[in-house]
Regions:
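Pyridoxal 5′-phosphate
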Residues: 1-383
Length: 383
């Protein structure tokens, strides 16, 4: 049975006041997530420290993330951010041999390129796969870059600037055929698309809770394929990455046998309350239904933008796009500000305004956005 999306809108108070199209930056706050924050604060006020409950909450986040990704909990590290998870992973990779290339693309969020460039003093060679003239990155561009010297292909699932979605299955096949590992940054897709790390045959995946997973900043995840964990020993570590946390052993580094070895210090307790509530909400609705809903909304938005002669630069095919509709503007910051004056919340990256849709949006949100864009086209249209 399809979820009652109109009823679910009532769980997000901001929707009564705003046309909220900014989930690709920060998801709308659900009543359940607000209540989870309040439960944490109430516990702090009445009990002070409650470590047993807090660790259990962190483990719940691990288990729920595994369920979302079709993984197992031992393959999930609960991290402070994508940056923290990738830094831990990078510290475990050996670049001293001939297989020292890292492939990234023009679609990457800065973190996913910067961290690998930071490994260059350790021997890494970072190669960028460029866009084609049409603004997309076809599979053949990756085929030309990935070779037998490639250690890792580190790619985004959905580009944060233009909403384009890479051909992940095709890139995975290319990488594995040449003996390379694959890392997927799915921050711009997880929670809005149905992601199965096993079906995609991923080696690593990273994401966070503040966008389509409805949680908050300061908490994320790193998925590591179970068969790879023992071969990777991060030097970027901490006491919560140890096999026996409570041993307080200062005589050596003895990492956990599972993906917890990619964690570091004390978990972000308050954030785990929010993340758990957000994950439960998304799982209850179901990512297959969410994906179908989001594609319908973004398709309608792109069609309506065509009608007002201000087309999006986001690819039109479902297989090539995520849930962000990117619209070019000669003053994207000014356009986003003018939309906000009309109670339409968007974001801007580069020359584009981003309208990021989630299951709690509806057709009226599309029409409000397009009507405002029609009015503002003369002042803020494309160059």
């Amino acid at each position: 049975m399809e979820p009652n999306f109109q009823a679910l809108r009532k769980e997000f108070p901001v929707l009564a006041r705003k046309t909220y199209l900014n989930s690709g930056s920060y998801g709308a706050l659900a009543n359940d997530v607000k209540a989870a924050f309040e439960a944490y604060m109430e516990g702090r006020l009445l009990m002070g420290a409650n470590w047993d409950a807090w660790i259990a909450k962190n483990e719940s986040v691990r288990a729920l993330t595994a369920a979302l990704l079709h993984a197992v909990p031992d393959e999930i590290a609960v991290t402070a951010s994508v940056s923290a998870g990738l830094n831990a992973l990078a510290s475990a990779v050996d670049f001293s041999g001939p297989r020292n290339k890292v492939i990234v693309s023009d679609f990457e969020f800065p973190t996913n390129a910067q961290i690998w460039h930071a490994q260059e003093p350790r021997g890494a060679r970072v190669v960028h796969v460029r866009c084609a003239p049409d603004g997309y990155i076809p599979l053949e561009n990756f085929a030309a870059a990935i070779d037998e010297q490639t250690q890792l292909v580190a790619i985004t699932h959905v580009c944060y600037r233009n909403g384009a979605k890479l051909d992940v299955p095709g890139i995975v096949r290319l990488a594995h055929a040449r003996g390379a590992k694959i890392l997927l940054d799915c921050y711009q897709s997880v929670g809005s698309l149905d992601i199965d790390v096993k079906a995609l045959d991923l080696d690593f995946a990273a994401g966070g809770m503040l966008k389509y997973l409805l949680g908050t900043a300061g908490i994320g995840f790193l998925y590591v394929r179970e068969s790879l964990i023992q071969s990777l020993v991060p030097t970027n570590t901490g006491w919560f990455a140890q096999a026996e946390i409570a041993a307080m052993d200062i005589t050596g580094n003895r990492p956990a046998s599972n993906a917890r070895r990619f964690e570091a210090g004390t978990p972000a307790v308050a954030n785990s309350y929010a993340a758990e509530a957000g994950l439960k909400f998304v799982l209850a609705v179901g990512t297959p239904a969410i994906e179908q809903r989001n594609y319908a909304l973004t398709r309608r938005c792109m069609q309506r933008l065509e009608e007002i002669e201000w087309p999006s630069i986001t690819p039109t095919q479902n297989g090539r796009r995520g849930m962000t509709v990117a619209v070019p503007s000669r003053d994207s910051g000014g356009l986003s500000a003018q939309l906000l004056k009309r109670d339409i919340v968007t974001s801007h990256r580069g020359d584009n305004v981003r309208a990021s849709f989630h299951f709690y949006n509806d057709e009226d949100d599309v029409e409000s956005f397009v009507a405002a864009m029609r009015d503002l086209r003369g002042s803020f249209g494309p160059r």
